[in-house]
């Protein structure tokens, strides 16, 4: 899930996965 992709688009995919 990339619900945070919009707000965390500046972060790496690894961080995006951790935010989930």
Swiss-Prot record:
Q: Which residues form a coiled coil?
A: none
- Give the superkingdom in one word: Eukaryota
Which conditions up-regulate this protein?
A: Expressed at a constant level during a 12 hours light:12 hours dark diurnal cycle (at protein level).
UniProt keyword annotations, A-Z: Calvin cycle, Carbon dioxide fixation, Chloroplast, Photorespiration, Photosynthesis, Plastid
Q: GO CC annotations?
A: chloroplast
Reply yes or no: does the keyword Plastid apply: yes
The protein's location, in the record's own words, is: Plastid, Chloroplast
**GO terms, biological process:** reductive pentose-phosphate cycle
Q: Which InterPro entries match?
A: RuBisCO_ssu_sf
Subunit composition and interactions: Heterohexadecamer of 8 large and 8 small subunits.
What role does it play?
A: RuBisCO catalyzes two reactions: the carboxylation of D-ribulose 1,5-bisphosphate, the primary event in carbon dioxide fixation, as well as the oxidative fragmentation of the pentose substrate in the photorespiration process. Both reactions occur simultaneously and in competition at the same active site. Although the small subunit is not catalytic it is essential for maximal activity.
Task: Give the free-text miscellaneous remark of the entry.
Answer: The basic functional RuBisCO is composed of a large chain homodimer in a 'head-to-tail' conformation. In form I RuBisCO this homodimer is arranged in a barrel-like tetramer with the small subunits forming a tetrameric 'cap' on each end of the 'barrel'. In this alga, in contrast to plants, the small subunit is encoded in the chloroplast.
What family does the Swiss-Prot or TrEMBL record give for this protein? Belongs to the RuBisCO small chain family.
Indicate what this protein is called per its UniProt record: Ribulose bisphosphate carboxylase small subunit
């Amino acid at each position: 899930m990339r619900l945070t992709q919009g707000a965390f688009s500046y972060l790496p995919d690894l961080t995006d996965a951790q935010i989930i």
